[in-house]
């Protein structure tokens, strides 16, 4: 009996030694290609470069497939085909992926009291043109576009997996949530192949798996605004979570000396004019993506209240007010910085 126990103990020790050495022997493989209008980067720790490349290839295929469904830039996308049915008197059946992201989006709009709203497509279209022409949208055109906006006019039928866009001319736009959704979906594909220590960066919307071998987490660089528009680089240490940053320091339009953010207030149809940078950490990249967008629109107190609805989520807001930089954060955000 004692001899058997010794043999079992020896086996466990040897097995543990082998597993540890396998983990430590893993290398980091990085794969990158353009997707959804942004650099799309996949990082995988693995022992086998060929298998890692195969997993990355499957993940990129997943991203491309979802983009063909969600993109409003692709005329033949499923989203645009759905938009074309707006104002009709019937529900349109949609794919499982599109229905799933629409459910996410409507829940996001409800929880944020409309600060995130996927029905802003007609207004977003005007602002895209305005950015190209470096002028504000025509007020009359903006008024007409705003009449087509409202997430409450999007109706879902769970049983039939179908959608009715009540108002004619409605255009759904999944910006502010789509990249996070795709990042999370592609990470799930990679992890399903056995590569748990992996990370996906979809144009700054980052889905993060288990920590790299022998480390406490992935080192994620973010930039925090400082006084006089300087940027302070900081490192976060993260695992099994996601992070997204949003704000007008990255995309904005300057007209007549006034700065307009690429993020539009759904209540007014006007690009945000305050200078704010928002970083959100949450368990799912879809959630961190739309929360970062919503918290760029909401007042600070409402942003902090919204984050509390998601256990473990963290928020950092940096805003320039009257020439002075103000920072607000949830108590747990500081713990994610690398010491």
Predicted feature locations:
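Mature catalytic core of soluble alpha/beta enzymes
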Residues: 2-10, 23-339
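Hydrophobic h-region of N-terminal signal peptides that target proteins for export
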Residues: 14-22
